[in-house]
Amino acid sequence: MTTAEPRLALATRGLTKTYGDGESLVRAVDAVDLEVARGETVAVMGPSGCGKSTLLHLVGGLDRPSSGEIDLAGRRIDRLGERALARLRRTDVGFVFQAFHLMDELTVVENVELPALLAGHSPRRARARAMALLDRVGVEHKAGSLPTALSGGQRQRVAVARALSNEPVLVLADEPTGNLDSAATLDVLRLFEELHESGQTLVIVTHDERIAATADRLITMRDGAFVDETRLTGGTSGRLGALAGFES
Amino acid sequence: MQQEVVLALLAKEPSHGYQLRARLRQALGPVGEAMNAGQVYVVLTRLEKAGLVTTERPERPNPAKTAKDPADRKTYVLTPQGQQRVAEWLTEVSWPKPDLAEFHLKLVAAAAAGLADPLGIVDTQRRELLRRLREAQRAAMAEPDGSDAALLLEGIVLRLQADLRWLEACERSWTTRRSTS
Amino acid sequence: MGRLLLVARLAARDLRRRPAEAALLLLAIAAATTTLTLGLVMHGVAGDPYQRTREATSGPDIVASVALNPFTGAAADPAPLEDLAGADGVTAGSGPFPVAGSEIEVGGQTADVQLIGRSVEPADVDQPAVTDGDWLRDGAVVVEAAFAGALGIEAGDTVTLDGETVEVAGVAVTAAMTPYPWSNCLVLCAPFRDDDGEGEGAAGGGPARPEPQVESLTDPGLVWVMEDELTAFASSPDALSYVTYLQLDDPDSAQAFADARQPQGPGDEDKPFLEPWQHIVEQVTHVERNAQRVLLTGGWLLGILAVASVAVLVGGRMADQTRRVGLLKAVGGTPALVAAVLLAEYVVVALVASAAGLVGGRLAAPAITDRAAGLLGGAAAPSLTAGAVLTVTAVALGVAVLATFVPAIRAARTSTVAALNESARPPRRVGWLVALSSRLPVVLLIALRVAGRRPRRALLGVASVTVTVSGLVAALAAHAELDAQLAANPDPRMERLGDVLVVITVTLVALAAVNTVVSTWATVLDVRHASAVTRALGATPAQLSAGLSLAQVVPAFAGAVLGSIGGPLLYDAVDQEDVVMPPGWWLVAVVAGVVVAVSVLTLVPARLAARRPVAPILQAETA
């Protein structure tokens, strides 16, 4: 981390991604302006096909925009080449996917240390860091197991640990609870809350209202564009009883 | 608060009022936070009048449990009628009715009269529900795993989620109606 | 009946759904069966025309000859040959006929010839069979068929023998002498060749001999002339040799008969030299037998490669097949039906391939076995025996069945639900490889892990390259020896053997190349998801494509090393004669060449895979 850290972890201006052309032109992401402050948790909601996953891939450097700018931690990334984007994914971004995308033939700890190895860290350091991260997400006792032996919630915890491997500026999560039951979802939400408290910047794309409701900021997306933005903070406290039908 | 809840809590053993309150607090967690201290006693008094509960004076008052309220010294016991009432209550299948018709009619009326944009109403409602969801979800996240209250909170969360999904359906429907009209 | 139809229809559907794979499979098996057919056809060819010629010409069991003593200059004496005709066991004989050296000139070409003086009347033993024109008459000669073919001489032509012009009455074949240019020398020949120099009396010479004082011939052709005209055409009419053809009551005892009467060393030069007919057969069929060994070995090597190819192809589509099996079973197919469908597909391919191989091999055989007109029936097409057809078909079917049996059984045994749910074969975990790879550079890390996910495919890769390189090294060694032989001794048949080697080598390499591409492609498809994740985690496309490529190169390197050890062993096994091992730098060059070739072959699929956009793959696999 540099000394002069920009206030924003992520900023996009007029970010656009189109597919096809002419009659069949599809605007997957349409002129999106997004600013995410450091330490902020932003949820992007919308029906499937609204372009929220594409947005995530664009800001994470998995895909290149058709036009518009992306600033990641104060650095323009929208015109970077494949190689530079790969390096960026290695150092500045951590991904968490709906399908976990863990490698089934690698043990939990081997999965978590993979990004560090790809980034060229020594095997010893990568292993130590992976163990620390597994400890942090609470699955250190499963370090030697294969992912298939883990529950969905545990797998997603491992995936989060992997995303944190190289201390990214930004963690990007794509439907992180999409494959999880209610209890496991709660588990992941708690983990995100811990990350949030430790100052990690998070952008989560989801159609799970529970994640959306717990974010600092909720953005609603339709047809590739932002249509609504809400901060849900503010007191409604003491109404839980009413919500449960337990009127006093 | 329903009388049957207090009755049922007495079914296990005769209890003091403060014991009942503590049991309620434990089961409800943050949901029961707004519960008034005297509320249990109000209900108990009503139950006593109805002959479902009687009180006993302790023969050997426990000096360790010095209550502030004189009523607290009493132990409440179920009467046979009270026990019967509990048994009946347990077999009942009543369920809180969600009043969706009201909101639905609100949208229809607003649209018909041109008084307000149904989508605006939906949006406002959605934010309100999200705020509620946020509160419930945060409370749920704060509960330790396996607590009684966590289960209750999960119920709240899931119902709010269902409501939000319905609002989404409302939004979709009213958007297409607007664009086709 | 209905079930059979169902199986056939399902199998046909699936084959049509993936025509490229079916074609590759066909190609792999057809290449192997073609080579095998060639090898088997050659087996029948060797010896057969000679036998026919022997019968047609009353071929001799013993060819006995005496020549002028090259060291003393003493003239040859035909008397011992006449004595031989009366020896025990001899049932018939002809000769002795005089033999003289000469030079033929025709159409501007000159060549050495041996002239054998014969009469117009047919001899009891060795009456050359005329294939063109007529037998001897006054003032006309007859030319041996292979020699005539080589010089382009036909009946009715005019040739010059030692300056004398003479007409060619006809062209004939004989079983008493190996066809040109491997002719036995009845007169003095130079240089003395080890392999067929026995034809002259001076062959088994001692250490301290004086230089031959008589002019000698080089690779002479054979011309029959009227006995009384012989001296007119001879270069040195004084230096005559004599030859006698004998038949024995037991032709199999010819070798023993010869051994008992053979000249034993210095001082024995005046004794006749005896050549048993088996020796001539040996000479005649030498090249064919070598070609046959090469073809059979090549056929087996190609067969092994075909198995590897089929296994990779089949394994690569296992994931897809498993789902299909699930579907089949879900709608009520029994495991037997499922296995039958899977097997049917490959059996159909194998049958077509073996048919193609039989036809291809049968058509290609004459090109390799054609020995011009050296012997009667030599130019006739070699025949396919029922046994050969059966063998080739059985091998092709074996390849298909072997390569599909395990997957078919496994697929059929998989539980229906698991088969429906399972989208892919789960990768295997090779713990030590994962641990080792984490200590290596990123590219190697990716390569070893990719290879480790499918250890059996990696082993097949090793096996495939081992087989190819073994074949390649053996072929190179054989080629080198052949070149050396050809340099000393040009022979169209040996050149053709060289062509056979080249064809087999090229087929072997081509099949191995196909294997490599197929294997790379299967790997690329297989690790598509893992590749996408790896790239999402920060591997560059260059690292990934290098890794995918290396995942093939590493087993190929292992295979090349094994093959360069196995190659000489294979060559040793195929060629029973003294083997000149190829020099070490050859093997190093072959290994390096294989590594480069595999890198190049895998480059395109690996690059394509590594540059594919990542996002859609990660999206598509959310389920």
Pin down the residues of each PLM region.
Chain A
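ABC-family P-loop ATPase nucleotide-binding domain
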Residues: 1-18, 231-248
